Amino acid sequence: MMSFSVLQVKRLQPELITPAKSTPQETKFLSDIDDQESLRVQIPIIMCYKDNPSLNKNRNPVKAIREALSRALVYYYPLAGRLREGPNRKLVVDCNGEGILFVEASADVTLEQLGDKILPPCPLLEEFLYNFPGSDGIIDCPLLLIQVTCLTCGGFILALRLNHTMCDAFGLLQFLTAIAEMARGAHAPSILPVWERELLFARNPPRITCAHHEYEDVIDHSDGSYTSSNQSNMVQRSFYFGAKEMRVLRKQIPRHLISTCSTFDLITACLWKCRTLALKINPKQAVRVSCTVNARGKHHNVRLPLGYYGNAFAFPAAVSKAEPLCKNPMGYALELVKKAKATMNEEYLRSVADLLVLRGRPQYSSTGSYLIVSDNTRAGFGDVNFGWGQPVFAGPAKALDLVSFYVQHKNNTEDGILVPMCLPSSAMERFQQEFEMITQEPKEDICNNLRSTSQ
């Protein structure tokens, strides 16, 4: 295995990729879901591809993706613009066609040599997604940065950084799919993009009709060691949920929940409990976990057209005092997670938009008592084919301060879910211990044993 301390990535000067044809010069408003403070962040994604001569016939991936990107921007031209801030901090897109920042690079390494180093939290992210000075702002900066790095094995890594106000994971996937289709020879995207951000404007007059614990002010009883501004001792580590881990967790929940809880629910309950224990949060402190819930599709009755690529989700929060969360069996946390997710519907999303306008676009709390989880396992990044087949890995490159992403990962023997966590170093060691204990094979079914002794 090579030493990654001497990994050499050679980059050409960044260039701005503009739409291949003339596009409208106009101003477009973001929705009131899009421009909330919580989404004014950059999200890194990494996608890794093997060489596949039988499919691409020695095509240059940089050239193919660059050309397809320019053609796709004809349809997604707002992404080639720049954000401006209007009255009351309302964000608008100046569709000026300035372009997306694009970097061509090469590295003296193979995918096989990289091994698990491509998985989140990717320790080589700064090499495969270089942060060019002045490019990472929210206002007046490129809305996307894409770096394509060719490897010595013939494979390549596409890493990108997205201004989250422009779209969510499903919107980004729609754009990447359009690029991929054009790289494979399509003349137009199979799904045409729809802007229509006014569909998620606040109502007139705005009215808050639901409880939104995710935006509530928190009285923090902790020692202040974990805040978003205290990054000096923060570390990241990923945790794997395979068949064995899920089997063990399911043995810890009451029978009436087994048939109704999803893998996402169970993982979220596990992480919430382990994290609260690891941080040694004051027993009387209120702790919360928010689940990002996609509003698309028929399930939540939010009427959005096919092709809508804006942010279309909310993150309802489950709330508990730390003491009962830590002391009760897993079923306690699981029921709270399920109830929080069940609150999501069209009325909830519209109430969020109204709250954001009435309260000046508040951000979620930055205290350690809050965790946000986002399920990217069904976003479809693993299906994006630029002409080299499906990626060996594709998804978020790391966790954010209080945000963990669930990503699909296939190890040597099975499909599972990988979850990067961000915690203070001392808490991370305790989290590791709690995780290992809670996912150990039990000698007997605890819940069934409790039921039998109570009869």
Curated annotation (Swiss-Prot):
GO biological process: one example: fruit ripening, climacteric
Active-site annotation: 164, 385
Keywords carried by this UniProt record: Transferase
Enzyme kind, highest EC tier: transferase
Gene3D superfamilies in alphabetical order: Chloramphenicol acetyltransferase-like domain
Keyword Transferase: yes
EC number: 2.3.1.-
Leader peptide range in chain numbering: none
GO terms assigned for molecular function: acyltransferase activity
Listed InterPro entries: CAT-like_dom_sf (IPR023213), Plant_acyltransferase (IPR050898)
Anything else known: The fruit of cv. Royal Gala exhibits a high ester accumulation, whereas the cv. Granny Smith contains low ester levels; this influences strongly the ripe apple fruit aroma.
Family: Belongs to the plant acyltransferase family.
Task of the protein: Involved in the biosynthesis of volatile esters which confer ripe apple fruit flavor. Alcohol acyl transferase that can use a wide range of alcohols as substrate to produce esters.
Protein's UniProt name: Alcohol acyl transferase 1 allele RGb
Organism this protein belongs to: Malus domestica
Taxonomic lineage of the native organism: Eukaryota, Viridiplantae, Streptophyta, Embryophyta, Tracheophyta
